[in-house]
């Protein structure tokens, strides 16, 4: 079996750059996922993020999860639970406006550390988007502009903990789905596994690695690349031992960004048969909210129905 793609970003600055770009392109085309090492975010900062996140969960969320979810979700069940997830989560918004100061129960160290971490992830996301542009033959900055809208991109972090589950065979930590947005940067637990992606009809583990950042592509990049890159189904399998930490940061288009295949990636002779629609990102998100755990193709088809109403202005400039 092929091994999960791991990209050493230190090699981007030397004679192995072309080969490394090839690995990134192959991962985007054939996996929809890859894992970055030596990505430039200090290991000491990542250790601090992990420490304060796990401390916050134990102090503020663990008991709440036991009372509100764990005590009720598995009571008397015999068949698989398909309408909920075994996870404890909250969301931090960074762009266009941060909400970190408003989220209750966060101490000042946590707010400061997560703000620093988010700023570094934002830069890494934009750097990766430019690498994707290079591999796709698009002008530098194209994807960032495509995401921009009038107020810039949406960027936020879902902080999740997946506690041990006594009936891990009957409930998922997180049910299978593709991500709606752009590019996702995940800092995951390096000891407790659980994340899996679907490749060639088989569920494959995303290996936990210390200080790595896992990258996956969302539905919007599939549309903009006209299907050259694909978003991929993934899930979190509940574990009987250990609490898994997951800090997933989503660099997404702005709400009013108009998303459509890059003209340079649409073959002229098949323009009439475009697979992917043009739509406003916020409209897609409203649809996705109801259909997250279903196939993405009907979502794309549904957006074609409203395509006639989309006012396609020029691509935004930063």
UniProtKB/Swiss-Prot annotation:
Membrane-crossing segments per the record: none
Cofactor requirements of the protein: Fe cation
Catalytic activity: 1-aminocyclopropane-1-carboxylate + L-ascorbate + O2 = ethene + L-dehydroascorbate + hydrogen cyanide + CO2 + 2 H2O
Domain of life: Eukaryota
InterPro entries: DIOX_N, IPNS-like_FE2OG_OXY, IPNS-like_sf, Oxoglu/Fe-dep_dioxygenase_dom, Plant_2OG-oxidoreductases
GO biological process, one term: ethylene biosynthetic process
Induction: By water stress.
Keywords tagged on the record: Ethylene biosynthesis, Fruit ripening, Iron, Metal-binding, Oxidoreductase, Stress response, Vitamin C
Gene Ontology molecular-function annotations: 1-aminocyclopropane-1-carboxylate oxidase activity; L-ascorbic acid binding; metal ion binding
Short name of one Pfam family: DIOX_N
Residues noted as binding Fe cation in the record, renumbered to the chain: 177, 179, 234
Homology family: Belongs to the iron/ascorbate-dependent oxidoreductase family.
UniProt name for this protein: 1-aminocyclopropane-1-carboxylate oxidase
Native source species: Diospyros kaki
């Amino acid at each position: 079996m092929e091994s999960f793609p791991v990209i050493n970003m230190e090699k981007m600055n030397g004679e192995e750059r072309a080969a490394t770009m090839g690995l990134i392109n192959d991962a985007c085309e054939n996996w929809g996922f890859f894992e970055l090492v030596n990505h430039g975010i200090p290991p000491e900062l990542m250790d601090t993020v992990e420490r304060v996140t796990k401390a916050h969960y134990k102090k503020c969320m663990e008991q709440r999860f036991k009372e509100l979810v764990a005590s009720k979700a598995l009571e008397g069940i015999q068949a698989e639970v398909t309408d909920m997830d075994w996870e404890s989560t909250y969301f931090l918004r960074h762009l266009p406006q941060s909400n970190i100061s408003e989220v209750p129960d966060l101490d000042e160290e946590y707010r400061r550390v997560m703000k620093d971490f988010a700023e570094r992830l934002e830069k890494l996301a934009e750097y990766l988007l430019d690498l994707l542009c290079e591999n796709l033959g698009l002008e530098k900055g194209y994807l960032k502009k495509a995401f921009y809208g009038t107020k810039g991109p949406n960027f936020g972090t879902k902080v999740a903990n997946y506690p041990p589950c006594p009936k891990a065979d009957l409930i998922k930590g997180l049910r299978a789905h593709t991500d709606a947005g752009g590019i996702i940067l995940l800092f995951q637990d390096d000891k407790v596994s659980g994340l899996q992606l679907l490749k060639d009809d088989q569920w494959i583990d995303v290996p936990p690695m210390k200080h790595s950042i896992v990258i996956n592509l969302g539905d919007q990049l599939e549309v903009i690349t006209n299907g050259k890159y694909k978003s991929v189904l993934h899930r979190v399998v509940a574990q009987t031992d250990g609490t898994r930490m997951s800090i997933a940061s989503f660099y997404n288009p702005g709400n009013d960004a108009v998303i459509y295949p890059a003209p340079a990636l649409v073959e002229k002779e098949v323009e009439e048969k475009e697979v992917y629609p043009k739509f406003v990102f916020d409209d897609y998100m409203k649809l996705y909210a109801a259909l997250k755990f279903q196939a993405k193709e009907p979502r794309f088809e549904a957006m074609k129905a409203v395509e006639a109403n989309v006012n396609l202005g020029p691509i935004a400039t930063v």
